[in-house]
Amino acid sequence: MNKEKLEIIHSWVSANVEEPCEISPASNDASFRSYWRLSFDNDTKILMHAPPKLEPLESFLDINIRLESIGINVPKILKTDKSKGFILMSDLGDKKYLDVLNDDTVYCLYTDAIDTICKMQKEASTENLKTFDIKEQRSELGIFRKWFLNEHLKINDETINKTKFNQGLEVLQNKIDSIPKSFVHRDFHSRNLMMTQKNNPGVLDHQDAVVGPITYDIVSLLKDCYITWDEKLTLDMLHSFSNKIKDVYNFSSEEFVEWYDITGLQRHLKAIGIFSRLNHRDNKTSYLSDIPRTFAYVEKVLEKYPYLTNIKSACHELEIKNLL
């Protein structure tokens, strides 16, 4: 953390927080936002700083209100300073799902998380939310092409265009666009869920919420880029989720698994692109270690559905696995 950044944080706290407190980093984030824990004698609070020109606060505040109004455990907003990019909020603790998940806790923790997804889908307002449409999918998959294929693997566009990669993505995008849509958190995974004593889980990083595929948040949870589970366990949890929402949507079990798989494929390609961008643009090298795990999810799905053959063949022709 550079000295100038620290001075900005300390200056804001001095001017806006009356009680004396200790300031320490609360978490690392895959964005321009930073989080700080303010420790008081008998309490802690979280201070989020998001440079206004890079990470406007309006979306975070908007989605926070939507989720809080239906009983989702999101931080309580205590003070905002939009002009300088600060939000002071309640502290949901330091027990990320990623740190406490194991074979003994996974069913309980994921059941709570699944109930939260169901509640968001059924009750959260989607008024004026952006739709996760083909244009948005295409933009995200462009991150994979630019930052992973071009920048990280040094594969130029001419080489990519000799394959049927683009044609394969068009098929994928159209398939995903036909999936029923609902409120989507969009980053519902083990680093953004906090284990809490009451109303578990605490839900963070919700500012990018959209109206999107009903399988988006569940695949973010069960095919997590940061932790892998046995396929039987994830399918059991998936069926538990589908049983809880089947009264709202019309689908067969096979169809739902397919929606889950292809939504995950799009998300995982995007995530690989973002991990590469974090390394090359933002000097956050630790995310590179998550690429092999994420690409393994991609490979499994490409083997399952014949209409994904063009993407599968392109990955083989570009020798992606050998270059990881």
Protein language model regions, located:
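Active-site activation/catalytic loop segments of kinase-like enzymes and analogous catalytic loops
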Residues: 143-152, 214-250, 262-282, 294-301
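ATP-binding pocket architecture of kinase catalytic cores
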Residues: 36-139, 143, 153, 177-178
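An alpha-helical support segment within catalytic cores of ATP-dependent transferases
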Residues: 5, 9, 13-15, 125-130, ...
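ATP/Mg2+ or Mg2+-diphosphate-binding catalytic cores
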Residues: 273-324
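Histidine/acidic-rich helix-loop-helix segments that form or flank divalent-metal centers
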Residues: 250-258
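Secondary-structure capping and boundary motifs in well-ordered enzyme cores
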Residues: 109, 185, 210-211, 260-265
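Conserved NTP-binding catalytic cores of kinases and kinase-like/nucleotidyltransferase enzymes
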Residues: 1-86, 196-201, 315-324
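Active-site acidic catalytic loop and adjacent metal/ATP-binding pocket
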Residues: 25, 34-39, 47, 120, ...
